[in-house]
Amino acid sequence: MTSQKGLRYDGSIDKYPITEGEIYSLGNGSKITIADITLGLPEFSKNADCVFIDPAGSKGVLKAYYTKAEKQCPVDNFDEFVAHIKRCIEQINPDRLFVECFYRNKKQLVPMVESLFPHVKIYENIYYHKPDCKCWIIQGTKQAEDWGLQGMDEWDAVFKICKDVPFSSITDFFMGQGLVAQAAYAAGKVFYGSDMNRNRLAVAISKVAKRGGEWTVTK
């Protein structure tokens, strides 16, 4: 059973008690809200011209995410989950897509990106700044591009993407605790974030606030 402390993460939800239907916004147009992609994307996410996502690596991990969000997992298998991801990307129709993946979900996510973009590049990366923690970033673009992400830690790669890639806005519909939000804010870029877990989103909101972001809340 997941502990109450685990469900609440660092307790940011007490300061930023985001609820269903609320939108947290910054002055530059960046927005965060609660959403489950199996039920649809927030409309503002469809305005992004760049996407970075780090989806669950397996059906078991996905089920655990729903448990932590105190919700029932609505998909029967991982392929069904990937189909929801693809549908969301098609609705956004971005110029560039970056998908972080791991050994367990790489075989499903690479073909998905290949079906959406004419140019696909796969970078080998690490996470937690540990060489033995391997991951990959799958890049889908309309033109051949190399953003120099090979070998980087995923944290540094996301900050590099937000700093160097010429997008107008970036969306992450698995926003979690807000790596993409922090990186985009640090680069002065607009971001759109959503996640089904309000406690995780509260951490993202808090981390951007600690970088100077001033949030307003609307319904």
Positions of the model-derived regions?
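Class I S-adenosyl-L-methionine-dependent methyltransferase catalytic core
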Residues: 1-219
